[in-house]
Curated annotation (Swiss-Prot):
Organism encoding this protein: Vibrio cholerae serotype O1 (strain ATCC 39315 / El Tor Inaba N16961)
Name of the protein in question: Ribosomal large subunit pseudouridine synthase B
Cysteine-cysteine disulfides: none
Residue ranges with Polar residues bias: 302-321
Family label: Belongs to the pseudouridine synthase RsuA family.
């Protein structure tokens, strides 16, 4: 075996390549007692690899089932495993698993809510995040200020940001009142605060941002804020095939569409909602944990506007079919 250390560790389920590269740069990874350096290759299958002083396996997770969670991130949560200030993170409410850990597929900034995927497969996470894959991300965005046809044309054609050209693949008007307007926008990369910066380049302020789709995976309307659901085999294999990974043959979910299964699903959903409420109550009562949990929205109300364009303002570009 002669592969880069971060690739071997990612395949073994210890994180995404990006996370592991950061650990190596920080001097937290060693090989046979020596601190590893970025770009180092693992030549020996029997090498002793440690992360933060703990010996870790470098064997590929071939026999481990790939799992993917869809999580409804609330505003205010951080996309980090641990926060030194004790603020809430997206990992706080995820289910515990043995022998592996959840890896986030990209990030959402603290003020952004919506769909965030997690997987146990580091290679899947890395490939989905890589810019070359051009995976679409769709957001529901509320902006404050006047939005002209010229501004929309600029956003679709592309504008120069500090880190290069950027553009929306699609812009669709979804309604609004006064100087508050709502749009669905699509991008195919995950640069830091890209949606907000694109709007800001046109002198328009984003007042609310929510991710509603990643590839063909949509945020489930029945999922509460702070809740999660595990993707079924078809959805998992859609993501794997999207980035040219072999499909899985089984899942940890029982997908039999019978009455008993539906009852279990309802029970599971109720348990998730109760767990979310308990977590929020516990956080609110814990000293040193800042911020209140976001207020719950009533279900529905968004999707009905999705295919309608308000009469008072028309987007200059029709959504793609």
């Amino acid at each position: 075996m002669s592969e880069k250390l971060q690739k071997v560790l990612a395949r073994a389920g210890h994180g995404s390549r990006r996370e592991l590269e950061a650990l190596i740069r920080a001097g937290r990874v060693s090989v046979n007692g020596k601190v590893a350096v970025l770009g180092e290759r693992l030549e020996d299958d029997n090498a002793v690899v440690r992360i933060d002083g703990h010996v870790v396996s470098v064997k590929a997770q071939e026999e481990v089932i790939c799992r993917v969670l869809a999580y409804y991130k609330p505003e205010g949560e951080l996309c980090t495993r641990h926060d030194p200030e004790g603020r809430r993170t997206v990992f706080d409410r995820l289910p515990k698993i043995r022998g592996s850990r959840w890896i986030s597929v990209g990030r959402l900034d603290a003020n952004t809510s919506g769909l965030l995927l997690f997987t146990t497969d580091g290679e899947l996470a890395n490939r989905l995040m890589h810019p070359s894959r051009q995976v679409e991300r769709e957001y529901l965005v509320r902006v404050f200020g006047d939005v002209t046809e010229e501004k929309v044309r600029n956003l679709v054609r592309g504008v120069q940001l500090e880190d290069g050209m950027a553009r929306f693949e699609d812009v669709m008007y979804a309604g609004g009142e006064g100087i508050n307007h709502t749009f669905y926008v699509v991008i195919n990369e995950g640069r830091n605060r890209e949606v907000r910066r694109l709007w800001e380049s046109q002198g328009t302020t984003v007042s609310r941002l929510k991710r509603v789709r990643y590839g063909d995976i949509f945020l489930d309307k029945k999922l509460p804020r702070g809740g999660w659901m595990e993707l079924d085999l078809k959805q998992v294999n859609y993501l794997r095939e999207l980035v040219e990974l072999r499909p899985e043959k089984e899942t940890v979910l029982n997908m039999a569409p019978d009455a008993a299964t539906r009852k279990r699903e309802r029970t599971r959903s109720q348990k998730i909602r109760r767990a979310v409420r308990r977590h929020e109550e516990r956080i609110s009562a814990t000293p040193g944990r800042s911020g209140k949990a976001p207020a719950r929205r009533k279900p529905g109300g968004e999707s009905s506007t999705r295919n309608k364009v308000a009469n008072q303002q028309q987007s200059s570009r029709k959504p793609r079919g």
